[in-house]
Amino acid sequence: MFYNFISKDSILYRLILCFGIGIGTVFGLSPFSFFSAGVFASISCIFLFFSLNRTSIWKAFLWLLILSQILNFTAFYWIPGAISRISGVNTFVSILFFFLYGLISHLKFFLFYTLFRFSKIDSASKTYILLIFPAAGTLSDMITFQIFPWYWGNLISGSIVFEQFASICGVYGLSFLLLFISSTFLILVNYYKYKNSKEFKTSIASLICITFIYGFGLYRIGYINQSQNELKPKNLSVLMIQPDTSPGTKDLKADASYLSATMSKVFSLAIPTFENSPSLIVIPESAIPFHGTIDSEENRKEKIYSSTMEGIILYLSKHTGADVLFNELNLDENKLRNQVSLFKNLDGKTERYNKRRLLPFGEYLPMEKNFPFLRSIFQETSRYVPGEFPKLLIGNKIQNQRSFLPPEISKLNEPKTYRYEFSSIVEHTNKIRNLEYSYSILPLLCYEAMFTELVLDYFQNEQKPEVLINITNDSWFDSELEAYQHSGAVRLRAIETGLPLIRSAVSGISEVWDARGIPMIVPIGFHETGTRAFSIRLDAIESTIYTRFGNSFLWIFCILILISRLIFVSRIERKS
């Protein structure tokens, strides 16, 4: 009936499908998280691809270009403002960059469609689509570059039960699952009147597979909660702060009143007001911008070292007996690093992780060597140098730690006083005697947490992480939708690894999830100032299948499906 009014080859029909993908995407992602919206987006994609198969490949690519911009404006409309604030460009450049971003970030549709087109599936009622469509979509998710990555698997966030499949196949496995569910739905709709047909029976078999995956999700949600190590539980008490300070633009770097107000706010929030002190204090990215705590000649020369910032970190640890996780900038052989640092109360030493995945045009300027004039356009862009290796941060929980006030709170800008106290041999010996356990943190700085590959490489070594901590600064984007989309994408890392995940954002949303991706606290909302004190269990029994094998099996499976189909198509064409 629908096709009596709108032709499958018409511009209107294709525009409706493009908007169907865009609207389905925005409502499939957080904060809406409608599972049906994700299915709607993928079904719209199927029908768009079939419509494009009836035109030339160049016209099809033109439509995919249109799709990329429709997706931009429906789901990621916050990007132009973010570009302007992060890099300091004017409105014209930010809009121009927005269009370019849409093309680059949605290149996966070009690969997705190309693989689908050459698979020669001429109808949504063909059972080949059950595997070809998911394999092509998943492979394009895994291969193509994205700036702020979103995957088809992110659109399944409306079902916490289906999301548990990520513990086996990761977010890419969820991409395959969503596209498989959508394909199965289409076959069922087409053949539900023909129950004796081969196609209907195939769709029922697919439905049984989906039911098994759902059953696994239910089992995992119940099993994880009962599989904690009760003999030697490792409970870590944490204080997380969200100061909601304004973005540290370069013109504020020399503003003493701004820096003083920012540091005071962080300091006042991080001093616990309850009797039981935390074992770990988590301070988000850029809570204290521009500065670091390494008192080196090059840091002093570039005015990066801040004695007050170091004094605050030392004071907090001394006052609470806690380790302190925070973000800082430091020069290392003339290379400016963006770091996650852990100050350890046990010995007064600091471990540091250098951020490996930098934000283009925000933290570094691509092609700056070839086009130096870009620096005059993107004036707020930083000059960070990426780290080379993953690094776990090892903290310690010490028994019988009591909160007390160190002397001379007025001397925060003279950290030597506090440094001396941490060097006491007697105190250090007592702490070692009272050491309850050590714990390992997998640090993720800002949008690094959106890339599953950056998490997987931590599981290749003997020492495994026990908790994931993502400290981030979303204040640059000034968009509640972005904050929710970012947070929703990060949550999957907890399910993939089977570990609790703490997300501490300077302006929101700050959340904590257990190994199933289920919230453990009431989140601190967007542009709220607040703290959360909570306890997490660190005694995961075993690694997930995904952390042991990664994406290897999914790569092989998808490639074999597509190669088999292409061989089959080429044989048919040769015979004809």
Swiss-Prot record:
<keyword id="KW-0012">Acyltransferase</keyword>
<dbReference type="InterPro" id="IPR004563">
    <property type="entry name" value="Apolipo_AcylTrfase"/>
</dbReference>
<dbReference type="GO" id="GO:0042158">
    <property type="term" value="P:lipoprotein biosynthetic process"/>
</dbReference>
<keyword id="KW-0472">Membrane</keyword>
<dbReference type="Pfam" id="PF20154">
    <property type="entry name" value="LNT_N"/>
</dbReference>
<dbReference type="InterPro" id="IPR003010">
    <property type="entry name" value="C-N_Hydrolase"/>
</dbReference>
<comment type="pathway">
    <text>Protein modification; lipoprotein biosynthesis (N-acyl transfer).</text>
</comment>
<feature type="transmembrane region" description="Helical">
    <location>
        <begin position="92"/>
        <end position="112"/>
    </location>
</feature>
<feature type="transmembrane region" description="Helical">
    <location>
        <begin position="549"/>
        <end position="569"/>
    </location>
</feature>
<feature type="active site" description="Proton acceptor">
    <location>
        <position position="285"/>
    </location>
</feature>
<feature type="transmembrane region" description="Helical">
    <location>
        <begin position="204"/>
        <end position="224"/>
    </location>
</feature>
<keyword id="KW-0808">Transferase</keyword>
<dbReference type="GO" id="GO:0016410">
    <property type="term" value="F:N-acyltransferase activity"/>
</dbReference>
<keyword id="KW-1133">Transmembrane helix</keyword>
<feature type="domain" description="CN hydrolase">
    <location>
        <begin position="236"/>
        <end position="538"/>
    </location>
</feature>
<dbReference type="InterPro" id="IPR045378">
    <property type="entry name" value="LNT_N"/>
</dbReference>
<protein>
    <recommendedName>
        <fullName>Apolipoprotein N-acyltransferase 1</fullName>
        <ecNumber>2.3.1.269</ecNumber>
    </recommendedName>
</protein>
<feature type="transmembrane region" description="Helical">
    <location>
        <begin position="60"/>
        <end position="80"/>
    </location>
</feature>
<keyword id="KW-0812">Transmembrane</keyword>
<feature type="transmembrane region" description="Helical">
    <location>
        <begin position="128"/>
        <end position="148"/>
    </location>
</feature>
<feature type="active site">
    <location>
        <position position="355"/>
    </location>
</feature>
<feature type="active site" description="Nucleophile">
    <location>
        <position position="446"/>
    </location>
</feature>
<dbReference type="Pfam" id="PF00795">
    <property type="entry name" value="CN_hydrolase"/>
</dbReference>
<comment type="function">
    <text>Catalyzes the phospholipid dependent N-acylation of the N-terminal cysteine of apolipoprotein, the last step in lipoprotein maturation.</text>
</comment>
<dbReference type="InterPro" id="IPR036526">
    <property type="entry name" value="C-N_Hydrolase_sf"/>
</dbReference>
<feature type="transmembrane region" description="Helical">
    <location>
        <begin position="168"/>
        <end position="188"/>
    </location>
</feature>
<keyword id="KW-0997">Cell inner membrane</keyword>
<comment type="similarity">
    <text>Belongs to the CN hydrolase family. Apolipoprotein N-acyltransferase subfamily.</text>
</comment>
<feature type="transmembrane region" description="Helical">
    <location>
        <begin position="15"/>
        <end position="35"/>
    </location>
</feature>
<feature type="transmembrane region" description="Helical">
    <location>
        <begin position="38"/>
        <end position="58"/>
    </location>
</feature>
<dbReference type="GO" id="GO:0005886">
    <property type="term" value="C:plasma membrane"/>
</dbReference>
<keyword id="KW-1003">Cell membrane</keyword>
